[in-house]
């Protein structure tokens, strides 16, 4: 009898141990996920959209936090949110014309307002506003019809729900800290994520934000990311996961995000030191003007040339550019943003071959420009017009067979030393956004 009890106990411990190993085993992406990663890495250009009831205040997406408005007073804005000029098809047409390959939309930002018909809360655009239309659903349909990949932004934090354990933001909205209930909030999030991944067709990626809200906690906060990531991958194995946490990648993630910075840099100051760059597909998100959400006084839009040069430098780092627009409260995209999209689209129709499907070149971006690679061809993007008529030295890794001006038959003389260093003179040319050389290995 004692022997049987010992054997039963040993079997139980073995089962428990096996379960523990299974739960902590490193994430292994599926074949569908790996294909999705490769497709994503080739896209190079996407559009980010920050839109919610915060657009009505015209002060950016952090208005609730920055103003210290009571959450109940803020929520009254939903009663008047009626974006009658919203047309998902027109949005997607503008993005495709701009050369974008995917769209990332804020389904729910830090203010907690959901932009779809969610059963997990009545604080959403269908139930809490007179608009009564499912924006996520309409955008998803438009994207699928146009063969545009749809990514969904989802905030891990909430400045209005009392069950969310507040971190360093959202402390002046009238929430009662003693009512925090992480288990309840975590269940709420997973219910919403399940809706997003089961109601709107194929989702290219889930883009998380808010991890940084607890980066000052004395005891590290457990976001329980891995179980949530596993749930997403079970629902849609090809769905990529990215998290704007400003840290090294976490187990279960499929892409690495850099906010307002090129990969590996920290000019925006979001991390104490430059985050290590992983071997995952990379994405840089950047605003078209100064804010993510609509801000009426922010008319400091980047020029077409600046956006193109940002795209070039991002591609030169082997990353995608996710360019943000804050739609107006009436549902229209700002006229200046549309103008910039048209300009970028015109450039990409002429030179997209040097961007789409490329990887980083032999040199990282330089003050004069950047290099992208496709097969045995490297595209040298010279964005500094001051180099016209002057010599340029390139540190390359392979022997060069020819150098020509992209899109022409003009061959350029060059010299290459034994250590593969290439020297040539840039032809004189009129001022241009990007003078491109085609270097064949």
Model-identified regions with their sequence ranges:
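Bacterial Sec-dependent N-terminal signal peptides
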Residues: 1-24
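Mature catalytic domains of secreted/periplasmic carbohydrate-active enzymes
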Residues: 23-441
């Amino acid at each position: 009898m004692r022997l049987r009890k010992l054997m039963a106990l040993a079997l139980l411990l073995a089962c428990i141990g096996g379960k523990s190993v299974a739960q902590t085993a490193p994430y292994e992406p599926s074949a569908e996920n790996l294909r999705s990663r490769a497709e994503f890495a080739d896209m190079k250009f996407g559009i980010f959209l920050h839109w919610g009831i915060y657009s009505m205040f015209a002060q950016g997406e952090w208005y609730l936090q920055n103003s210290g408005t009571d959450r109940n007073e803020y929520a009254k804005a939903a009663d008047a949110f009626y974006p009658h000029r919203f047309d998902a098809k027109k949005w997607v047409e503008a993005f495709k014309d701009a050369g974008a390959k995917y769209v990332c939309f804020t389904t729910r930002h830090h203010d907690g307002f959901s932009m779809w018909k969610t059963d997990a809360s009545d604080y959403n655009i269908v139930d809490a506003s007179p608009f009564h239309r499912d924006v996520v659903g309409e955008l998803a349909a438009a994207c699928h019809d146009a063969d545009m990949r749809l990514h969904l932004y989802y905030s891990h934090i909430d400045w209005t729900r009392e069950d969310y354990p507040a971190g360093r933001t959202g402390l002046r909205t009238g929430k009662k800290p003693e009512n925090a209930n992480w288990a309840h909030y975590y269940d709420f999030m997973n219910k919403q994520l399940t809706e997003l991944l089961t109601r709107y067709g194929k989702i290219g990626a889930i883009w998380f934000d808010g991890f940084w809200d607890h980066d000052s906690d004395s005891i590290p906060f457990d976001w329980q990311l891995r179980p949530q990531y596993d749930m997403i991958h079970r629902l849609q194995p090809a769905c990529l996961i990215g998290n704007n946490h400003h840290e090294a990648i976490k187990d279960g993630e499929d892409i690495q995000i850099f906010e307002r910075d090129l990969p590996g840099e920290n000019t925006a100051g979001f991390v104490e030191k430059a985050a290590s760059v992983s071997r995952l597909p990379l994405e840089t998100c950047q605003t078209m003007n100064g804010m993510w959400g609509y801000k009426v006084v922010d008319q400091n839009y980047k020029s077409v040339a600046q956006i193109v040069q940002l795209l070039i430098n991002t591609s030169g780092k082997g990353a995608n550019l996710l360019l943000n627009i804050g739609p107006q409260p009436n549902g229209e995209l700002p006229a200046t943003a549309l103008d910039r999209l048209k300009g970028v689209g015109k450039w990409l129709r002429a030179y997209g071959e040097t961007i789409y499907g490329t990887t980083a070149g032999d040199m990282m971006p330089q003050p004069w420009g950047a290099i992208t690679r496709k097969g045995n061809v490297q595209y040298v993007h010279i964005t500094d017009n001051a180099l016209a008529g002057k010599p340029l030295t390139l540190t390359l890794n392979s022997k060069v067979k020819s150098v020509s001006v992209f899109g022409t038959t003009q061959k350029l003389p060059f010299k290459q030393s034994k250590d593969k260093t290439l020297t040539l003179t840039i032809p004189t040319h009129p001022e241009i956004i990007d003078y491109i050389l085609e270097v064949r290995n």
